[in-house]
From Swiss-Prot:
Biased composition (Basic residues): 302-316
Transmembrane segments: none
Residue span of region Disordered: 195-236, 263-320, 336-362
SUPFAM superfamilies per UniProt: dsRNA-binding domain-like
Top-level taxon of origin: Eukaryota
The encoding gene: DRB5
GO MF terms, alphabetically ordered: double-stranded RNA binding
Cysteine disulfide links: none
Name of the featured protein: Double-stranded RNA-binding protein 5
Feature: compositional bias, Low complexity: 263-280
Length: 404
């Protein structure tokens, strides 16, 4: 793991790959190995009590990464690499693309005399502006702005693990007076097992069908981006969408103190927290295909099972201060076609009051966030019936949370 991280850092920095030199010590019946890694001209020695050669190389790479991370931001090799290669701008662009937002917009202002200009740049992402340090060139000023934006966003990063899924990134985003919980996670547990079984089934036709479906999805996303959100302005569409969840998440509870810390506010423990059912509104994305009801039913059962297991691990106690209620995947696993009568019965989903569908997401129509906010008191099981469900949680105990 550490060797891979060190190698990735070398590739991003356009340096030569790390080289390892190992020595063997001790008697033949109990050998000990020690490794030395050379990275960008610097040598780092690992411990000498490793029992295998592989363990010694990983230990040396771990020592190198630890020493590089302890250096100051101005002299850190990692910071220099990220700054010089423009990785911060790439990270912001990838974040906006994965979240379904508009790409970051950079605004640069030139000041000072002509022979010694000074450039100051600001970047706008998801309705929030971040200003970077002044620089002598426009390119460097934009890098500074991207670095400031990424550092500010990383301060709200909360990493947690909830079986059967591993949450790669959990953000508390304050936007428009509301608090949105955004979860990016890698598929695991039941969802990952089903996907692995589909990959290893040996059915060539099924894999080809999956490729065609993926290509069609990319085409729909391009068409949707060209149309500017399907009939509304691009600015309004990006403001409504905030951040979009691509992968799978389970029902989980998040303390108000954690959300308040992410929002930059202190939490008053004396004030009672509102109930999760009264503070949650849903955005329902119905599918156009007739099989969506059957698929979503399977996803609902899997999510409910994961939620019960998570509640059992917490001793049956539910924290209603801030509740991120069941974010579903873009497309649930495929199942056989059910009879039309069963499909019609499963497609009877209560619609949020005043829920228009002004624009479409990739292949799916999406209700607006404002209309879904009117559906107070609805259970998540009533909203999760078909397609994609994104649930917004408003934390009333945090008065006017400031953007992060």
């Amino acid at each position: 793991m550490y060797k891979n991280q060190l190698q990735e850092l070398a590739q991003r920095s356009c340096f030569s790959l790390p080289s390892y030199v190992c020595t063997r010590e001790g008697p033949d019946h109990a050998p000990r190995f020690k490794a030395t890694v050379t990275f960008n001209g610097e040598t780092f020695d690992g411990p000498s009590n490793c029992t295998t050669l592989r363990q010694a190389e990983h230990a040396a790479a771990e020592v190198a990464l630890a020493r590089l991370s302890l250096r100051g931001p101005s002299s850190s090799l990692t910071a220099r690499v990220l700054d010089e290669t423009g990785v911060y701008k790439n990270l912001l662009q990838e974040t906006a693309h994965r979240a379904g937002l508009k790409l970051p917009v950079y605004t640069t202002v030139r000041s000072g005399p002509g022979h010694s200009p000074v450039f100051s740049s600001t970047v706008e992402l998801a309705g929030m502006s971040f200003a970077g340090d002044p620089a002598k060139t426009k390119k460097h000023a934009e890098k500074n702005a991207a670095m400031a934006a990424w550092s500010s966003l990383k301060q709200s990063n909360i990493r947690t693990t909830v079986s059967p899924l591993v949450f790669d990134l959990v953000w508390i985003v304050c936007h428009g007076g509301d608090v949105f919980v955004v979860v990016w996670c890698s598929a695991g547990g039941a969802q990952g097992a089903r996907r692995r079984r589909r990959r290893g089934a040996g059915a060539c036709g099924r894999r080809q069908g999956a490729r065609r479906a993926e290509a069609a999805g990319r085409l729909r996303r391009r068409r949707w981006r060209r149309e500017g959100g399907g009939g509304v302005s691009t600015e309004e569409a990006s403001r409504r969408r905030v951040l979009f969840v691509r992968h799978v998440a389970v029902q989980t509870s998040m303390g108000a103190s954690v959300a308040a810390a992410a929002g930059g506010r202190t939490q008053d423990t004396a004030s009672p927290a509102p109930a999760a059912a009264a503070a949650s509104g849903g955005v329902r994305l119905p599918s156009r295909r007739r099989r969506a009801g059957a698929r979503a039913e399977e996803g609902r059962r899997a999510g409910a099972h994961a939620a019960r297991r998570h509640a059992a691990r917490q001793g049956g106690r539910r924290n209603a201060a801030a509740d991120a209620v069941l974010l579903r995947a873009v497309l649930p696993p495929r199942r056989r076609r059910r009879p039309d009568e069963a499909l019609r019965r499963r497609r009877r989903v209560p619609r949020a009051a005043g829920g228009e569908r002004p624009f479409s997401d990739p292949g799916l129509r999406r209700a607006t966030v404002a209309a879904a906010a009117a559906a107070q008191g609805g259970r998540s099981s009533d909203l999760i019936q078909e397609g994609v469900v994104v649930v917004k949680t408003s934390i009333q105990s945090i008065a006017q949370p400031a953007p992060i």
